[in-house]
């Protein structure tokens, strides 16, 4: 067993088989407005 990858396998790979996917943020960061509202809600 060698540590080097099999380059022949990589060159044979058919990129057209891959599907284009839209990446979507699963847990987007809150906006500055949201953070400010939460800070104010916590203070009162």
UniProtKB/Swiss-Prot annotation:
GO terms for molecular function: actin monomer binding. Residues 33-44 have a biased composition (Basic and acidic residues). The modification N6-acetyllysine is found at residues 4, 12, 26, 32, 39. Residues 1-44 are annotated as: Disordered. There is a cross-link at residue 12 (Glycyl lysine isopeptide (Lys-Gly) (interchain with G-Cter in SUMO2)). It holds the Pfam family Thymosin. The modification Phosphothreonine is found at residues 23, 34. It comes from the Eukaryota. GO terms for biological process: actin filament organization; regulation of cell migration. SMART domains: THY (SM00152). The modification Phosphoserine is found at residues 2, 31. Disulfide bonds: none annotated. Belongs to the thymosin beta family. Plays an important role in the organization of the cytoskeleton. Binds to and sequesters actin monomers (G actin) and therefore inhibits actin polymerization. Identified in a complex composed of ACTA1, COBL, GSN AND TMSB4X. Interacts with SERPINB1. This is Thymosin beta-4. It comes from Notamacropus eugenii. The gene is TMSB4.
